[in-house]
Amino acid sequence: AVQCECYFPMTPFRHEPPTTQRLMQCMRHGKACLMRLQVKGLRQRFKWWGFPYIPLAKVRHCEGYINDNGRLLSADHFEITITDIDFRIIAKEYDWDSLNVLDLWASDYGKLPKPLTDCVKESYTGKTSLKGVPGQDLYYVKAKGDLNSYYGMTAQDPLQLDTLFDEDDPDNLWSECADDPEGSYNDHRPHLFLPYQWGVWTTAHTRK
């Protein structure tokens, strides 16, 4: 439903001046924004709210924080990379002393291509109409798998590092070769036929 009904980044991302003022301008103009933020003095607006939004696993350089089952109740300092959708949710749930925009990219919102959404709708119709129908188990599983794959194809890791096997080192048989991550990305990029950002925004929309 998200991929059929919601809007996604549809133009190449443009690098914007990393300022709070420019971020607000981009969001007022309805741009899809990807940002890296530094936040100081974070705290919940409503301390009895039972489901804090920011996951501890997604922040970096976090200091002086209170962790509630993997979620941030407060923090003295941290960095995080989020979308404009995430930012709006965080702004409703939290207050902070200061916020610095370290990096900012913007794209234009639009609907996903009709051929893609038509495939999603067809698989969804098949999945829901075949569920529980005697003798249709195989077709139900196939339709369900197809439906899941449309998201999966947008969420492939864009940086596939080479894996090395060293039979002479039993304690470290497998290791990732990270000597040239940019080269690995460029080698893998031709296989990414659906934009990775569509997968990012799919999950962001579901969190609203």
Language model features by range: what are they?
Residues A1-K208:
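Conserved acidic
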